[in-house]
Amino acid sequence: DRELKKGKTQVPAYRAMYLDSQLKGGDLIKVEKDNAFRALIRNMQTMEEHKFQIPREQEKILRGYQKEGFYWIKTLKHNQFGGILADDMGLGKTLQVITFLWSEFQESAPGENRRALVITPASLVFNWMNEIERFAPGLPATVVTGDVKERKALIKNAGEREVLITSYDLLKRDLKAYQNLDFAVQIIDEAQYIKNHGTQVAKAVKEIRSEFRLALTGTPVENRLSELWSIFDFLMPGFLYSYEKFRKEIELPAVQYSNSDAMERLQKMIRPFVLRRLKRDVLKDLPDKLEKDMFSPLESEQKELYEAHTERLRLMLGMQSDAEFRTSKLQILAEITRLRQICCYPGLVYEGYKGNSSKLEMCMELVQNAVNGGHKILLFSQFTTMLDVLAVRLKKAKVSFYMLTGSTSKEKRAQMVHAFNEDERQEEPD
């Protein structure tokens, strides 16, 4: 206010929308806005009307809200801002970004740098490659993988019209190799990986030279304000001030003292640069998710084993003093885990068990009914040994399946997920 009263003031472009909203709310100061200021506000407020061309291949498959996401990303880049695409999980953030990358490549002039870098958790690296091959097969893309020598060669030979895909961990290791490259676009997936701004991963991501930066996350960005600051420090350094100033003026008042003014100020500042849509708001044509609890009472030998193990645990606890109880918590948790395993299938605890399991039988019945109805199924278990039992039963029932465990390599996992999505079938799990 002091600067405005003196006559003129200049603000960074990323402050324009916030300043405009504040000026509309008060009449104490009469302000004249120059043409550049007005044009910027108009561009950002009418971004859905910009006539950015959606590539023909994606035009046919994008939903309405995904097209809006594409226009939003293009508008941010056009105005030299960064942003957070925070759509709910399952709304196709990857597809929106791939459409944006493909449009950038198609619009580029000969010799113009359109090199892009996608940084993602290791488990999603090959998924990004598969999605590019599926939705934009003409988009040149390379997964930076292999040993140190191979990765350095891939980075060194990256063309100006190429998308490089790497993991957060490998970026940290290969940072020196990237220092000679300039990127037109830098994208971080699962942006919460840089939530702690002092970590080596966060510092590495921010050292890459890039013209336009975009962060993807499926969680509400206001959940943790220090995380939000770190992400914006990557996108537009200085936008949320230094962390010390941000913490003093916004984070502490909002979090510790529930200061609504501080939170409102933050929301007004970030609103133009965050796009979040929820499934319930944009997928109105889809039915609500139905949840149903099904109970399978224990029977015969399985019930006897469960009751015997329960009695054993009860006797063990009854004989312990308070001091012994406090020191045997891990043992007690192990016994409770065994009870859960007996509920799944007693053979997980008792070697050589040949009896039935009511829970296993119900599971197989549900699977068979779903398969007969032409449905796909995702089946989870906390016990890999239970997955082994299910694999035997599925083979016997001639039900095709894939089995993913912690020992499945990233490459194999990506192949399986792709095959499952494409309805390619195999009889044997790896």
Label the predicted regions:
Residues D1-R42, E112-N113, L228:
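Charged, low-complexity intrinsically disordered regions
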